[in-house]
Regions:
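Conserved catalytic-core segment of nucleotide-activated headgroup transferases in glycan assembly
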Residues: 206-279, 287-299
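Acceptor-binding helix/loop patch of EC 2.4 sugar-transfer enzymes
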Residues: 73-87, 133-171
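Conserved acidic donor-binding segment of nucleotide-sugar-dependent glycosyltransferases
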Residues: 344-353, 361-366
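N-terminal subdomain of nucleotide-sugar transferases
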Residues: 1-61, 252-257
Length: 399
């Protein structure tokens, strides 16, 4: 089967200036009979050397596309305020030249795969083919959720951005092609449901997000002594800020119950003030702003605390932790769309009281939580395996 992938960004094994890892890992263990040619706008600006490396790793051919001249000038001159005047998001005004369309049609592909929610006009250029459009999230759902958070209203610029972008993405999603030959692929169940509500009758398919990297050999799950190693992975950005502040304020208030039980590590930027506050309170705490080998660093820990306040789709760092044997303790947004079960293969908390209860309980019932971490890892290997998800994606072309 021959597939042509048309993408905003060039795939790479890691996220490079965009979500480039998802298409890479959807292809790396694809069925042996699937041949893929990639046409990329290279919005993430991968170097020629890196592109050749990806071609070799994925056994694909990558051809670069030119961005519309006017968009290049908008980006070069920092004229992004122009987005406010547009009916749709800026990158929705991208399509292929007739010459490129003819070239792709000449390859006689069995299907056209489009990656990136904004380039839906490209999907419409191949009406005679079976098409799968990987979004992978619903941007309108993201802005809808953002407008429901209190912290957004405290920042005038953030509020205005969300107010401007929400209707643009709603309009864009409402005019996605809705025909039997186009299937939309999302990595969020709520995202797929949201798209069906915005565009009734559209074929929106939820597929689990593939996990990325697993340490070899696999980590033996045995919590550290005398202190359990607790990891907080990711930047202290707007996705985590609200829930993280609530969680660590609780830990500061309950310092006598927790400080002798945990060694806390922040892996990411923006946590400096929190590190200082926890240290001053008596916690054993460290910060690593950059790890040369991210997975190796993750594997040094036992529990990952993921206090995510907002977001859509699937959280890659949660998948990384689960796949590498950590017990994940997180909010509903942290664990949504992941094939784990609260109290069986992860711990989901909805309040500071629930978080405190589990953090107090873990040191007293270590074996119970080690088994939970093992079940979490098993669930990810089965339900989020790259080979499995790639096969499911390719099967969409056959339906």
């Amino acid at each position: 089967m021959r597939i042509v992938l048309i993408t905003q960004i060039t795939p790479a094994s890691e996220n490079v200036r965009g979500t480039s890892a998802l298409p890479y890992h959807l292809m790396v263990h694809r069925p042996a009979d699937v041949d893929i040619v990639i046409y990329s706008f290279n919005g993430n600006q991968l170097s020629d050397a890196k592109i050749k490396e990806v071609e070799k790793e994925l056994n694909v051919t990558i051809k670069l596309l030119s961005r519309p001249t006017w968009q290049s000038w908008v980006l070069r001159l920092h004229l992004l305020f122009i987005r406010v005047l547009l009916k749709y998001p800026l990158f929705n005004y991208m399509w292929l030249s007739s010459k490129v369309v003819e070239e792709i049609e000449g390859l006689q592909p069995d299907g056209i795969w489009v990656y990136g929610q904004d380039i839906s006009r490209v999907t419409k250029q191949f009406g005679g083919f079976k098409r799968v459009h990987t979004l992978p999230d619903s941007e309108s759902l993201y802005y809808y959720r953002m407008l429901g958070r209190r912290f957004v209203f405290k920042n005038w610029m953030m509020f205005m951005r969300n107010m401007v972008m929400y209707p643009k993405y709603l309009r864009m999603e409402s005019v996605y092609e809705n025909s039997p030959t186009v299937k939309y692929h999302l990595v969020g169940e709520s995202d797929a449901e949201s798209l069906r509500n915005v565009n009734p009758g559209i074929q929106a398919n939820f597929l689990r997000h593939p996990h990325y990297h697993v340490a070899e050999p696999q980590k033996r799950i045995a919590f550290s002594k005398p202190k359990i190693r607790l990891l907080v992975a990711g930047q202290n950005n707007l996705y985590m800020k609200e829930a993280a502040e609530e969680a660590f304020d609780m830990m500061l208030h309950e310092v006598d119950k927790l400080k002798e039980c945990y060694k806390v590590t922040f892996l990411g930027r923006g946590w400096e003030s929190m590190v200082t506050r926890l240290k001053n309170a008596g916690y054993d705490v460290a910060q690593i702003t950059f790890a040369p080998d991210y997975i190796e660093e993750v594997c040094r820990h036992d529990v990952q605390l993921t206090p995510i306040a907002i977001g859509t789709g699937t959280k890659g760092k949660v998948l990384d932790a689960l796949a590498n044997g950590l017990l994940v303790v997180g909010t509903p947004f942290a664990l949504e769309n992941i094939a784990v079960e609260n109290g069986v293969s992860c711990v989901e908390y909805r309040s500071n009281e629930e978080l405190l209860s589990v953090l107090v309980d873990i040191p007293h019932n270590v074996q119970k939580y080690e088994q939970m971490a093992e079940k979490g890892r098993e669930a990810i290997f089965v339900e989020h395996g790259r080979r499995r998800i790639s096969q499911q994606l390719m099967d969409l072309f056959k339906q």
